[in-house]
């Protein structure tokens, strides 16, 4: 059909309106795509932890720490930043309690245990030597109080009381500890008790396996850091003789002396010597430093601080968002 001169402007306006509408819908669709990409970017972003060096080879230096075994791990990705003889089996002493805490928080997570549940101390739990909070037989404490006793003061008696409460016996609890360790891929670990007091040669782990279980505890149950970062706190003993206050002081001195330290667990026996798994956070980086068999308690803290300093100075955490950057498209 041939349009008359009068109808041409009207037709043009109709075509223009359709073109404008098409452009409008294209703009809306593009805006939606951009919004969706922006929203889902974090879901697809990969946290990557890399040393700020020309190569990413793990540092190996006998000069960094005195301890015969040690490892430094980034918590979010599990990247090993530094290691020294990290797979030699050694006695962990009270660092054992990290696995005990994992099982406690597993029970809390499943709902079979609550923070305000009460636990009665048995004669066996009371009989524990070493580091303890001096629970009396028949003494009743809440789960939360006993968690504090374990993670702050390294109470062997509190650990056994919790083990018996959860599984009926320490032996059964230890069986679950070994199953949990196997599930985490801790290939060089075997537990004989729930507190690390034993000096049995069949109770062992490695620096690497300790880092693995430390990472499991703090990433799956970050609430533990609320307790492990406490420097001092009082609990109340409630016994037949009455009530009395008892002070807990954190065995991890890095809580006060190292910037960003938020826990985690110390350990020492005549066989294990002095051990430590320390967690520190700065900005978006969380590091786990493990040292085993240091000659004295000062060296374990010095070695852990040295590894943490190395990690925070040499490494950075970034998010891989290349999928949505123009530079990435140009590189392709």
Q: Model-derived features: where do they sit?
A:
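Short, Lys/Arg-enriched N-terminal segments with co-localized hydrophobic residues
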Residues: 1-20
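Active-site-adjacent loops and short helices of periplasmic peptidoglycan-processing enzymes
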Residues: 17, 43-208, 214-219
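Residue-level signal for protein termini and structural transition zones
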Residues: 22-23, 27, 326
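Sec-dependent N-terminal signal peptides of Gram-positive bacterial secreted proteins and lipoproteins
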Residues: 25-44
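A generic structural signal for well-ordered coil/turn residues at beta-strand boundaries
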Residues: 30, 66, 115, 249-250
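A short hydrophobic/aromatic micro-motif that marks alpha-helical segments and, especially, helix-coil
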Residues: 37-38, 112, 170, 235-236
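Domain-terminus/edge residues, biased toward the C-terminal soluble/receptor-binding domains
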Residues: 186-190, 198-326
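A short, hydrophobic C-terminal helix/tail in secreted or cell-surface proteins
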Residues: 327-332
């Amino acid at each position: 059909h041939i349009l008359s001169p009068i109808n041409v402007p009207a037709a043009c306006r109709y075509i223009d309106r359709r073109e404008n509408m098409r452009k409008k819908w294209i703009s809306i669709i593009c805006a939606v795509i951009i919004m969706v990409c922006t929203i889902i970017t974090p879901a697809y972003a990969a946290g990557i932890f890399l040393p700020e060096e020309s190569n990413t080879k793990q540092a190996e230096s006998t000069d960094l720490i005195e301890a015969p075994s040690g490892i430094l791990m980034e918590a979010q990705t599990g990247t090993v930043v530094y290691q020294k003889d990290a797979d030699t089996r050694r006695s962990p002493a009270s660092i054992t309690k990290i696995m005990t805490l994992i099982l406690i928080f597993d029970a809390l997570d499943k709902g079979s245990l609550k923070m305000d549940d009460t636990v009665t101390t048995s004669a066996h739990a009371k009989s524990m030597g070493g580091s303890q909070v001096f629970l009396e037989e028949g003494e009743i404490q809440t789960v939360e109080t006993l968690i504090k006793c374990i993670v702050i003061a390294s109470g062997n008696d509190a650990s056994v009381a919790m083990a018996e409460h959860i599984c009926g016996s320490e032996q059964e609890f230890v069986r679950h500890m070994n199953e949990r360790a196997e599930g985490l891929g801790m290939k060089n670990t075997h537990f004989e008790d729930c507190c690390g007091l034993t000096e049995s040669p069949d109770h062992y782990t490695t620096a690497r396996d300790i880092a693995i279980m430390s990472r499991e505890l703090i990433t799956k149950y970050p609430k533990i850091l609320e307790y492990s970062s406490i420097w001092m706190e009082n609990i109340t003993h409630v016994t037949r003789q009455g009530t009395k206050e008892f002070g807990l002081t954190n065995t991890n001195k890095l809580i006060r002396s190292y910037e960003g330290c938020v826990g985690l667990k110390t350990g020492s026996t005549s066989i294990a010597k002095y051990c430590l798994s320390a967690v520190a956070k700065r900005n978006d980086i969380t590091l786990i430093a493990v040292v085993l068999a240091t000659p004295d308690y000062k060296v374990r803290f010095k070695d852990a601080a040295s590894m943490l300093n190395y990690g925070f100075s040499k490494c950075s955490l970034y998010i891989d968002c290349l999928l949505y950057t123009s530079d990435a498209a140009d590189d392709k």
